[in-house]
């Protein structure tokens, strides 16, 4: 035991030494980077701070970079949020010029903000999601970048504050109303331009398959066991309707997403704004985006709660539930090719195994179901975030925005990929479908009206026990003649109500 303890202590010491060396190397690399990068001095209320000269951000962004080193670049604030800030700040400058903002400064802000909206300045937005829950640092990131870029447009240097990030770019605004506003702008833009078109294409493709397969009668399955027949078209019609309803659900959330918090400022009262500012800026955003944004009916709700985002995420969660069911059904129906159900042939897109030659897997279905799992997880995060709106301000805004936008993008992209690389190329294996149909014992259900449930059950059990056909079992039990059986058991007549 003593020897083991000494060995463990020695190993622990070695690990500690390696860690110390690694940290020292990282510090040295950071120091070299510091010396090799030219800096300029920026100031905020905390005093001066060094900022890389090639970056447009200012003091508050730099402090956030130093204070929230969480997750690295992959955890950056989503690009749709950054672009939405560009839209909002451009519109704010436009409206503020009506209320006395120097037109020269206002026009420069609008030009700089347009560059942000177009994604031209993305490299100047380094902050991660994991920051203050109001998104203040990201709002200031936008203010500082736009202020410095506007100063350059006017022929001045970065950091001179000829255009001030607070007094000019953030005029009549608070992080508490700008961040929820860009959350809604980003979500609405992504839903209308990306998600809805993808889901519409998937719905159309599934509906097309439903029509293509409308005459193929197959055995149904409930509880994963044989059931009564239906057509493959009816089965795919169910999938198409699920997607259609999903589209309707997400569309029904948009009226709340179109309501903007801008003009509520710090706690919803509109302090430091002029009367009419909220209505005018919503109208300006609507004109800029060509989407029907309006000012929020109640600014206190718009700042303190994000029920609209939770509702939208809920619709995405429902869509994910539908898509997981659809993808699972399709891959199970395509299982095989020789030892599974094999009713469908799925497109063969790439080799499926590094050890089994010739194996091809339902990869699009697998990718889609993983996306659905992620979206369901995102909805949990959005739900928890939405429930933490204490008093006058929800302080989970960045994680709500990030998770919601992540879900929108994932469902949009995965739906498009699934439609293009799977659904569009699905083929029905008619021979296999027919074989399984006529082997099923559940065709016995059509005998119920003639011989009764108990006799029909006896026929099914006899056929299963002896491995014979239903017809043979019925005749052996003496409940039906051959002609009567052939008249009653017609799968094509079992796919709807009788006359």
Curated annotation (Swiss-Prot):
Subunit structure: Homotetramer.
Function: Cytosolic fumarate hydratase that catalyzes the reversible stereospecific interconversion of fumarate to L-malate. Catalyzes the dehydration of L-malate to fumarate in the cytosol: required for the massive fumarate accumulation during the day in plants grown under high nitrogen. Also required for acclimation of photosynthesis to cold: acts by mediating accumulation of fumarate at low temperature, leading to reduce accumulation of phosphorylated sugars.
GO biological process: cold acclimation; fumarate metabolic process; malate metabolic process; nitrate assimilation; protein tetramerization; regulation of photosynthesis; tricarboxylic acid cycle
Catalytic activity: (S)-malate = fumarate + H2O
More info: There are 2 substrate-binding sites: the catalytic A site, and the non-catalytic B site that may play a role in the transfer of substrate or product between the active site and the solvent. Alternatively, the B site may bind allosteric effectors.
UniProt biased composition (Basic and acidic residues): 23-45
Parts forming coiled coils: none
Activity regulation comment: Fumarate hydratase activity (fumarate to L-malate) is strongly inhibited by phosphoenolpyruvate, citrate, oxaloacetate, ATP and ADP. Malate dehydratase activity (malate to fumarate) is activated by oxaloacetate, Asn and Gln. Malate dehydratase activity (malate to fumarate) is inhibited by citrate, succinate, ADP and ATP.
Domain of life the protein comes from: Eukaryota
UniProt record similarity statement: Belongs to the class-II fumarase/aspartase family. Fumarase subfamily.
Active site (UniProt): 223 (proton donor/acceptor), 353
One example GO MF annotation: fumarate hydratase activity
Any one Pfam family match given in the protein's UniProt record, by short name: Lyase_1
Cellular localisation: Cytoplasm, Cytosol
Any GO CC annotation of this UniProt entry: mitochondrion
Main location, first listed in the record: cytoplasm
Region (Disordered): 19-51
Encoding gene, per UniProt annotation: FUM2
Transit peptide found in the keyword field: yes
Keyword Phosphoprotein on entry: no
Effect of loss of the gene: Decreased fumarate levels, while malate levels increase. Leaves display lower levels of many amino acids during the day, but higher levels at night, consistent with a link between fumarate and amino acid metabolism. Plants are unable to acclimate photosynthesis in response to cold.
Keywords: Cytoplasm, Lyase, Transit peptide
The name this protein goes by in its record: Fumarate hydratase 2
Residues reported to bind substrate: 134-136, 164-167, 174-176, 222, 354, 359-361
Site residues, Important for catalytic activity: 366
Record EC number: 4.2.1.2
Organism: Arabidopsis thaliana (Mouse-ear cress)
């Amino acid at each position: 035991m003593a020897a083991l303890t000494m060995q463990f202590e020695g190993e622990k010491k070695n690990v500690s030494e390696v860690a110390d060396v690694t940290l020292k190397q990282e510090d040295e690399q950071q120091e070299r980077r510091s010396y090799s990068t030219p800096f300029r001095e920026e100031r905020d209320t905390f005093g001066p701070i060094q900022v890389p000269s090639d970056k447009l951000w200012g003091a508050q962004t730099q402090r956030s970079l130093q204070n929230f080193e969480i997750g690295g670049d992959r955890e950056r604030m989503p690009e749709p949020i950054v672009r939405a800030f560009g839209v909002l700040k451009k519109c704010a400058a436009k409206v503020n010029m009506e209320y006395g903002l120097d037109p020269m400064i206002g026009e420069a802000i609008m030009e700089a903000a347009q560059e942000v909206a177009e994604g031209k300045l993305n490299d100047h937005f380094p902050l991660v999601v994991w920051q203050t829950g109001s998104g203040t640092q990201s709002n200031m990131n936008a203010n500082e970048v736009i202020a410095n870029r506007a100063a350059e447009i006017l022929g001045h240097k970065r950091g001179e504050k000829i255009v001030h990030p607070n007094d000019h770019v953030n005029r009549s605004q608070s992080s508490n109303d700008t961040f929820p506003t860009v959350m809604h702008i980003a979500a609405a833009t992504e839903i209308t331009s990306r998600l809805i078109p993808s889901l519409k294409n998937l719905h159309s493709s599934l509906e097309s398959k439903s029509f293509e397969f409308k005459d193929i009668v197959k055995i149904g399955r409930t509880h994963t066991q044989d059931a009564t027949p239906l057509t493959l078209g009816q089965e795919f019609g169910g999938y198409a309707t699920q997607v259609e309803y999903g589209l309707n659900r997400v569309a029904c959330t948009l009226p709340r997403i179109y309501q903007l918090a801008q003009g509520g400022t710090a706690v919803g009262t509109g302090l430091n704004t002029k009367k009419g500012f909220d209505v005018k800026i919503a109208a300006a955003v609507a004109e800029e985006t060509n989407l029907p944004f309006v000012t929020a009916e109640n600014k206190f709700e718009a700042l303190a709660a994000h029920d609209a985002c939770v509702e939208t995420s809920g619709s995405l969660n429902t869509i994910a539930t539908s898509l997981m069911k659809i993808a699972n059904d399709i891959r199970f129906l395509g299982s095989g090719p020789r030892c599974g159900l094999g009713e469908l042939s799925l497109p063969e897109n790439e080799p499926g195994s590094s050890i089994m030659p010739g194996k091809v897997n339902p990869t699009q279905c697998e990718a889609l179901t993983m996306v659905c799992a992620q979206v369901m997880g995102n909805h949990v995060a959005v739900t928890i975030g939405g429930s933490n709106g204490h008093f006058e301000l929800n302080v989970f805004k960045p994680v709500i925005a990030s998770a919601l936008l992540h879900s929108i993008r994932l469902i949009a992209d995965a739906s498009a990929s699934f439609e293009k690389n799977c659904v569009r190329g699905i083929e029905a294996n008619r021979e296999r479908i027919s074989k399984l149909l006529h082997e099923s014992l559940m065709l016995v259900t059509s005998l119920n009206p003639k011989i009764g449930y108990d006799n029909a059950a006896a026929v099914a059990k006899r056929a299963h026990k002896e491995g014979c056909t239903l017809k043979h079992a019925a005749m052996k039990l003496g409940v039906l003649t051959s002609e009567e059986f052939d008249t009653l058991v017609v799968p094509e007549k079992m796919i709807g109500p009788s006359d």
